[in-house]
């Protein structure tokens, strides 16, 4: 019987620099999904790679004193090294500088032009270099890029345009009739309400102001727009050919089952990409999932903030599987997750060293101590055994259900619930007490057999998330990996088998203080400059009115108005270490709000967030800038701030009561 096919891809990583753990999360997430699909019996094709063209790369290479190709060769190699370090099982690592990709992009552009979907004109408007995106004046938010909040520069040049509006109605109909196409649901609502329903403008798809890119075949002074180049990797990487000579691999795997991407590029993948495919008369991918961000403790990671955590640094401290476990376990389905060194140590010690590692070590040690390593099922059972078996046999079903919905963090929680149940079983049966009673030896053997069997099932389920740990556990138990079908039965471990007589520690406990001291040496904190202290004092003059407030009555409290606001633009307040100035959409209004959160959030990461706002405060000036409200945050004992955000998707302007 032929296997069902499953094609999964990540967004290709932009080669502007070394990827941090937030970037790395996406490929680890895709790898976990791909591995589990293989466990389910699918014929899986997993593609990732690097996006290597564009003006930003050209500028970076110039700064580095190398050619663009030399620059991307180096960065792409580093990205691939980290993907391999994280033990990702991709089938294809595509580069947009691959010759076969470049040739197909030229053909695709030419085909769209011949079809009348691309036409030549003149572009005059605004361009965001970091986003490689064009905007009209009306699309800018407070004069800044609506996507990243950074300044745009005027651009005036001859260009080719794609007729986006030609396919807009067709795309809207497709989204409405394919409810799973854009996930999570909140991303779909954002695309429909903010972009498609208001109407699409034609998209500029070529540039003449830089040279690092794929030239338009019939007009080589034009360079193909980087997103048209990058998005087509999903089909060129599996052998698509414009001339009708597509490979067997393309015919086998397209359309893709899942494009896994960051939530910040959902528009390109759910509007531009589907329309490009419609132009090529190709079927659309079955699902685009915009995953949340993995944030450092004080906000989105960025080199400018100095809060970047790199995957290879984490691996050096914790090991590959511990890092994989953390990023997969700590990321909710829809909301952003947080990573800190403290949390990493806490998770390793509690979940990996204690719950999992201690369970495996205790079970093997008791098997050696009481039965010379022989694990034999004597079938001397009690009701507690049936409870254990029923619990364990339900876990694979729960994991499959969670993974089918891409709820990876929930799936890992299910696996660890199995290990926790086994630990509880040890407390319930007390093997050490049974060992003291000569008449209970067969009962003791049965208990240890049940533990080994349960661990084998749990370890096999763990393979998609922590593959090397699975292998290490099964080797020590002298056991084979179970298939999901095998996991429908309890008792497949060969009775009379012998476990290792030298159990290894899976995860050694770490001392938080020692880890933080090493991190400090790795990333020493910069001393505060005198002028920064002086500046803080100057800022204090503007906010001196903020003091501890007296008790108020309920009537006083009811005077306050709280609403949900959506930050549509944000910029740093010049000459200020603390302040950000945000443009906040509240219902049909846009308010300007100044907040002292610059040390905790960058201006870029604020854009797009839904926050809680006090909307009826009397306007006041902070650092000379008018502020028309207050964005609410929580503060811990160490002075760390966290934005107060709605738990569920709520519209801007919703009242908080």
Named regions from a protein language model:
Residues 1-48, 100-104, 154-369, 411-415:
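Structured secondary-structure scaffolds
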Residues 470-556:
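Intrinsic disorder at enzyme termini
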Residues 287-290, 474-476, 581:
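Beta-strand segments within the central parallel beta-sheet cores of soluble alpha/beta enzyme folds
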